[in-house]
Amino acid sequence: MNINVADLLNGNYILLLFVVLALGLCLGKLRLGSVQLGNSIGVLVVSLLLGQQHFAINTDALNLGFMLFIFCVGVEAGPNFFSIFFRDGKNYLMLALVMVGSAMLIATVLGKVFGWDIGLTAGMLAGAMTSTPVLVGAGDTLRHFGLPSDQLAQSLDHLSLGYALTYLVGLVSLIVGARYMPKLQHQDLQTSAQQIARERGLDTDSKRKVYLPVIRAYRVGPELVAWADGKNLRELGIYRQTGCYIERIRRNGILANPDGDAVLQMGDDIALVGYPDAHARLDPSFRNGKEVFDRDLLDMRIVTEEIVVKNHNAVGRRLAQLKLTDHGCFLNRVIRSQIEMPIDDNVVLNKGDVLQVSGDARRVKTVADRIGFISIHSQVTDLLAFCAFFIVGLMIGMITFQFSSFSFGIGNAAGLLFAGIMLGFLRANHPTFGYIPQGALNMVKEFGLMVFMAGVGLSAGAGINNGLGAVGGQMLAAGLIVSLLPVVICFLFGAYVLRMNRAMLFGAMMGARTCAPAMEIISDTARSNIPALGYAGTYAIANVLLTLAGTLIVIIWPGLQ
């Protein structure tokens, strides 16, 4: 039996789509030196090559892919989006605006200088900034801009071509810039990280190990009574000295949870909770032959929960003001916008931040009720909320504004982005509403993006040879300029206008470019995870601004003729 593969793929859109995805994902795993191609560029390259062979896909799949992707971007940004406009977030907002605004301005000027159309210009901007949201925003706006069908098809093809030609240029140049730019300025990044660590009491170790607390029991003997010298637990300050917390006392056979006024007595059995190294710091009066095994005393349910910050008495306060240890709880991690941040007593908590806390189940529940709620341990997605807000986003995208003879619509990209932000924000405030497991969100977002990339590549592949020969050299040079010049402008603005700490500034710059590989290089250079504070500050707002930049450059382009 003979099987014509070309006819088989052309006759089955679903089969063609998944063949493109599988081959593209395999290609994306390849590395050029230390740089991995990535899933997006892998799928795009394969789809362009197959598009040259006149394979095509149903455009409905393309539209659904970008809609799912941009909606999930909004959901991820929602919990921390509005907090960016307050306190230190103003600096991050300005940095993101400078980065995105300067890139859009430079791309527009270069597009006019080289005589490109809006498709090539917007595609070059998206590729140089390694930003799929720019590509999505521009493509959606073009489709709703009322262009003649032949001009629309050409613009969309050029959009894909510009993105494909400049993506690797943007990624590699930013990674190289992240490696060498810190060495070109007079402040050492490691010194800057240590400086802010001293000012804020940070842990500069970028590879800090996290242990679960352990429970051990000790019997109070003459040495321990003498060491306590009649002081109560508050006066002894055992936690301040060692990091261990007295959770229970057995006295005369009765178990009790002590308060700060309790005084240790001869024959007491006490249960201490703390990290392994904290037990090692205990006074020898505790440890020298005094450890006991008491099943009931040690029978505590130590749990680790993720607490979402929500309540007004926690939002806007410093981490140290929560006094978690006073409640017998231990902080393991602080996560903001899916980014792990340093354990910093002076970090100002935002609504939607996630604190990973360990301790006795009852105490952790009490702390969670004070500052927010415990994140749902469920793998079930609230599909009703997902679908309802998706519908709202599509309806918002139908809104059209009329100015004299000129009209433009909000478009699906902006509408779905706004609806996603609202769903993410409401999820951060209501524990049982709109829950989407992070793994499920990542899968839908990544799948939507890959479907979108496959669609644009297949549609643009037929004309890539002609386009490459006409603008290839110009496009690569322009991509390099748009990739690096806004970073330099952003650095000068942050360093000399905002006067930011350099470690925080470089992290914020990489967040404004939404580039995780470059962020890892900055952290390695600083030998600290402190730059993650800046990265988290700009990342959420930058994703939104980049989507709007793709929409805006298409809207203003006709007025620049």
Swiss-Prot record:
The chain crosses the membrane at residues 8-28, 37-57, 66-86, 94-114, 158-178, 383-403, 406-426, 447-467, 478-498, 540-560. It is found in: Cell membrane. Keywords: Cell membrane, Membrane, Repeat, Transmembrane, Transmembrane helix, Transport. Disulfide bonds: none annotated. One of its GO terms (molecular function) is monoatomic cation transmembrane transporter activity. Residues 202-288, 292-373 form the RCK C-terminal domain. It is a multi-pass membrane protein. One of its GO terms (cellular component) is plasma membrane. InterPro entries: AAE_transporter, RCK_C, RCK_C_sf, Transp_YbjL_put, YidE_YbjL. HAMAP family: YbjL. Belongs to the AAE transporter (TC 2.A.81) family. YbjL subfamily. This is Putative transport protein KPK_3686.
